[in-house]
Amino acid sequence: MPVAAVIAEWNPLHRGHLLPLEAARHRGATHTVAIVSGNFVQRGEPALCPWQYRVAAALHSGVDLVLQLPLPYAVSTAEHFAAGAVQSLSALGCVDTLVFGSECGDLAALQRVAAALESPALPAELAPRLASGL
């Protein structure tokens, strides 16, 4: 019973937001979970639509379970937003796959960027450039 999850704001939810979950179902996921910011989104802005409307739309669109990302993570930086969401999904103990969409659509390019950001050499290479104002 593979479970796929997505981390989102859905402010508001639109068809494109559902594509990663639909792709996961086509790859064998039998259940889907979404963790979504509540009535406030990143940068502390109020959500366009109330939380309840976004949950109803997600459930109506086929998402099996919608969880609310705790407020301190929802209004935080992208790094803390993602960390809080991943920790929450991990605590469920049933999520097998984390799915996402991207504007570029190039998984290989995203993997290269991720590898570069995780490189132990990055801080040493970045520090002199930042110090020079680059």
Where are these predicted regions, by residue range?
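Nucleotidyltransferase catalytic core that binds NTPs
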Residues: M1-L134
